[in-house]
Amino acid sequence: MITDKTECNNPLFGRILTAMVTPFTENGDVDYELAIKLSNYLFENGSDGIVLCGTTGESPTLSWAEQHDLFIAVKGSLDASCKVIVGTGSNCTSEAVEATKKAYDSGADGALVVVPYYNKPPQEGLYKHFSSIAKSAKDLPLMLYNIPGRTGCNLLPDTVKKLMDFSNILSIKAASGRIEEVTELRAICGSELSVYSGDDSLLLPMLSVGAVGVVSVASHLVGLQLKEMIHSFQSGKVSNALAIHEKLQPLFKALFMTTNPIPIKAALELSGWDVGNPRSPLSPLNNDMKKQLSFILNSL
């Protein structure tokens, strides 16, 4: 239930949200049992919440039924204090509305709604799209997701400001790769909007200009270090935060040496988590890249 947008200043979803991979069996089926184990491990190792069925979770290759079953399995296994946010975005408004309603009815703590991809709507179309979603589940907190490098469409701060008239639009995952995106959003939308970095490597710089946390890939591996970095920054120990940031940069870079989530799935395998290969059209990490990744993991 949403009561007051000022909750965003003590962010409703927490500081570290792991964009969790979707584990697959050797046959390519969703491995729900392993998803339960992994999500609980993440919560015990620095994550305040879990984001399911996003980019890292390979949502384009999951059926709506698989996404629903994955949420039910994970949500039912976690402590109630761990927020579970579900990706419900689509480039078809009616599909996104239906998925968001279902997430709300199933007990999700929030929904991650990506900017429509491929069809490249104008700002008016984006406003109508997100308005329809917000109206469909008025008590479900929504996190907008701006990632123009994948969608081919940029959600502008002025449009976000208009969307904040809806009480359940509380936050945004800023994944344009531009630090100034945070500054622009805060200048126009104010501190009521919680801005999350969508890029681990930009977390510390974005914190310095007003971001509240991160939707992270690296937290699969270094969640406690990320938690320490954020705490250090918030408590004025900036030099310690910077030291952690610098130490983790090779990992941040390696996890995007090719298309996400290919590297993180390989990294988890190297760390003892047999989460399976990505579904086609993504392919497994090649051997040369896997050797580079192994070297970096061993140096942490």
Curated annotation (Swiss-Prot):
SMART domains with a match to the protein in the record: DHDPS (SM01130)
An example molecular function term from Gene Ontology annotations: 4-hydroxy-tetrahydrodipicolinate synthase activity
Active site: 145, 173
Cell compartments where the protein resides: Cytoplasm
Catalyzed reactions per annotation: L-aspartate 4-semialdehyde + pyruvate = (2S,4S)-4-hydroxy-2,3,4,5-tetrahydrodipicolinate + H2O + H(+)
Primary site of residence: cytoplasm
Similarity comment: Belongs to the DapA family.
Residues carrying the site annotation Part of a proton relay during catalysis: 55, 118
A GO CC annotation given for this chain: cytosol
UniProt-listed PANTHER family: 4-HYDROXY-2-OXOGLUTARATE ALDOLASE, MITOCHONDRIAL, DIHYDRODIPICOLINATE SYNTHASE
Name of the molecule in the record: 4-hydroxy-tetrahydrodipicolinate synthase
Domain of life the protein comes from: Bacteria
Function summary: Catalyzes the condensation of (S)-aspartate-beta-semialdehyde [(S)-ASA] and pyruvate to 4-hydroxy-tetrahydrodipicolinate (HTPA).
CDD domains (UniProt xref): DHDPS
Binding site for pyruvate: 56, 215
GO biological process, one term: lysine biosynthetic process via diaminopimelate
EC numbers, comma separated: 4.3.3.7
Pathway connected to this protein: Amino-acid biosynthesis; L-lysine biosynthesis via DAP pathway; (S)-tetrahydrodipicolinate from L-aspartate: step 3/4
Organism: Prochlorococcus marinus (strain AS9601)
Keywords: Amino-acid biosynthesis, Cytoplasm, Diaminopimelate biosynthesis, Lyase, Lysine biosynthesis, Schiff base
InterPro entries, per database record: Aldolase_TIM, DapA, DapA-like, Schiff_base-form_aldolases_AS, Schiff_base-form_aldolases_CS
Subunit structure: Homotetramer; dimer of dimers.
